[in-house]
Amino acid sequence: RYLAEKICNSLGCPLGQMNIQHFADGEFAVSYEESIRGRDVFLVQSTFPNSDNLMELLLMIDAAKRASAHSVIAVIPYFGWARQDRKDKPRVSIGAKLIADMLSTAGIDRLITMDLHADQIQGFFNVPVDHLYASSIFLDYIKTSLPLDNLCIATPDVCLLYTSDAAD
């Protein structure tokens, strides 16, 4: 909710109201507290730290489609399961493709996300994907505010080398 509020404040638009009802067995249901008929609905939801966030997003998408939203745009700052982007050994799932299929089946019209583990994940979707990079936000600050002669940028794996290369 915090990020959604910051985005709305920055854009000067109101944050829509939702209700999430929790049940004793751990299930939950979502509903919109206002009409979204004919509206473009942006759903801001990370898939981290657990799968409940993903399920909540899927239910929000479904509810928006059933409420006759004009379009449903999923804004996922952290796309979980993205490291599962290929079959690197026998008998493994491709989690990123499965999540893409689930989001598409639920009814998203577009995805906005940041710093995917691998660019190929964009191809898993049958809707437009806006893949944003945090490095574009931070590079100017790093270049102008930090002593570059002693700066080292590290990455947790090879797939993220493009980020550290961008600082050169």
Where are these regions (language model features)?
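Conserved small/polar residues in nucleotide/adenosyl-binding loops
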Residues: 162-168
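Active-site loop-to-helix "anion-binding N-cap" substructures in soluble metabolic enzymes
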Residues: 1-2, 6-158
